[in-house]
């Protein structure tokens, strides 16, 4: 619970409400959504992680700097970072070679398995297994986007709660 206390203290300055929730294990959740810098940072960190889009060179510090400078506001912004090449090269510990490697890694991440993309979105309750099941069932992201609540609950391991999280996303 020490980390929870630290998180609460860090969020007091935002004036956002902190909710305590009890599921299988207790955790806290900021109600600020995309207004909460920790939530935004966490979403991007998850998106670029090895199990998701697997983008090398976009660690927490770099992500934080890019978010702070306004270069990244949503996931799609990562794929136009080429437009900020000079700005990227001016970041601390980020020279031409680092930027070149990062942009190459971003390009490579454009052709990953569908389940990894679904997982990368960070939809609440959708882990790797559920993402695989969704990819196997629907075959394309467009088909998943067009799916109904009823279609979703037919997928292996997806019940009403998870189906609601997906449709709400």
Regions found by a protein language model. Name each.
Residues 1-169:
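Accessory alpha-helical DNA-binding modules that contact the DNA backbone or grooves
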């Amino acid at each position: 619970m020490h980390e929870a206390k630290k998180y609460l203290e860090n969020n007091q300055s935002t004036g956002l409400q902190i909710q305590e929730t009890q599921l299988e294990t207790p955790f806290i959740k900021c109600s600020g959504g995309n207004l909460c810098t920790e939530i935004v940072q966490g979403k991007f960190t998850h998106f670029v992680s090895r199990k998701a889009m697997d983008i090398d060179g976009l660690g927490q510090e770099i992500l934080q700097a890019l978010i702070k400078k306004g270069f990244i506001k949503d996931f799609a912004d990562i794929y136009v970072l080429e437009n900020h090449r000079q700005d990227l090269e001016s970041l601390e510990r980020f020279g031409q070679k680092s930027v070149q490697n990062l942009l190459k890694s971003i390009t490579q991440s454009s052709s990953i398995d569908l389940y990894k993309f679904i997982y990368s979105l960070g939809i609440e309750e959708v882990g790797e297994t559920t993402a695989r099941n969704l990819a196997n069932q629907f075959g394309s992201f467009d088909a998943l986007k067009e799916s109904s609540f009823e279609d979703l609950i037919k997928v292996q391991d997806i019940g009403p709660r998870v189906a609601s999280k997906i449709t709400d996303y």
